[in-house]
């Protein structure tokens, strides 16, 4: 059995337009349109952060990654509390990073502080109502299948693709 993996598809990331639909910055002026209204259709995770916050710098890339992997089942909105102090006060943000999930126009879940990817993924899976798989896991499964079929060339190509990510 031969598995052909399009290298461009395997390394694909959302385009700027797709990414903009999944991940955006918000402000006090646009919060209702960016968070409340979309949360009527799909869960919206709001990441309250600040540029000086060390834990924010490790959490935000993880949240962005899991948001992309969720494939539109959850959206992410980021709010810089230094630029949106009024909004942070209204939502009683005491420390950063603080993450709230909105569904149906209301906050339904959240956490404070940096979290490992496994916890962020579990948080998203609760919101999405099911597993959010890393694309790497699917590629590794394909590679294992290729090895089981003695297709070493395909397996090698798949493993190299994973390492290059």
Tell where the protein language model's regions lie, with residue ranges.
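Proteins that catalyze or organize thiol-disulfide redox chemistry
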Residues: 1-45, 49-71, 85-86, 96-98, ...
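Flexible N-lobe loop architecture of eukaryotic-like protein kinase catalytic domains
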Residues: 92
């Amino acid at each position: 059995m031969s598995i052909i993996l399009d290298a461009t598809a395997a390394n694909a990331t959302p385009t700027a337009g797709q990414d903009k639909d999944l991940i955006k910055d918000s402000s006090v002026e646009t919060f209702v349109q960016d968070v409340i209204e979309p949360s009527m259709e799909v869960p919206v995770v709001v990441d309250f952060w600040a540029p000086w916050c060390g834990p924010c710098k490790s959490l935000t890339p993880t949240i962005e990654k899991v948001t992309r992997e969720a494939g539109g089942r959850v959206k992410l909105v980021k709010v810089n509390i230094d630029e949106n102090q009024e909004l942070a006060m209204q939502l009683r943000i005491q420390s950063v990073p603080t993450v709230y999930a909105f569904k149906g126009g209301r906050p339904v879940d959240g956490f404070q502080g940096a979290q490992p990817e496994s916890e962020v993924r579990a948080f998203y899976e609760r919101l999405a109502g099911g597993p959010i798989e890393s694309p790497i896991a699917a590629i590794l499964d394909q590679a294992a299948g290729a090895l089981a079929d003695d297709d070493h060339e395909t397996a090698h190509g798949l493993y190299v693709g994973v390492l290059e990510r």
